[in-house]
A protein has these predicted regions:
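Structural detector for short beta-strands of small beta-barrel domains
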Residues: 1-13, 67-71
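Intrinsically disordered, low-complexity segments enriched in polar/charged residues with Gly/Pro
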Residues: 4-7, 22-24, 54-55, 66
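Short, basic/aromatic beta-hairpin or loop at an interaction surface
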Residues: 11-25
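A generic structural signal for short beta-strands and their flanking turns/coil linkers
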Residues: 15-17, 40-44, 59-64
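Generic short beta-strand segments
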Residues: 24-25, 44-51
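A short, exposed loop/beta-hairpin motif centered on an aromatic-Gly-Thr core
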Residues: 28-30
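Short nucleic-acid-contacting surface segments enriched for D/E, G, S/T with interspersed K/R
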Residues: 32-46
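OB-fold/S1-family single-stranded nucleic acid-binding modules
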Residues: 49-71
């Protein structure tokens, strides 16, 4: 899967990572303890499961990443 966008933001002592994949409208999210190099344009292998996130009272579909590895 090819990464089209990768955003990292700090929340408490975690770094929240949001990755968008080519030809997929749903964001893939995961947490890390440290900042990571930008994955934009990289090919990655993902293990994930579907989930939902509540934003401003709306339920949004997200994918929770269990494992991400650069292919």
């Amino acid at each position: 899967a090819k990464v089209t966008s990768h955003v990292q933001r700090v929340q408490d002592d975690w770094v929240l990572n949001t990755v968008m994949i080519e030809e997929c409208d749903v964001p893939f999210k995961y947490k890390r303890k440290k900042q990571y190099k930008n994955l934009k344009g990289q090919r990655v292998n993902l293990t994930y499961y579907p989930g939902t996130e509540s934003v401003a009272g709306m339920e949004l579909e997200i994918m929770k990443v269990v494992r991400i590895k650069i292919a």
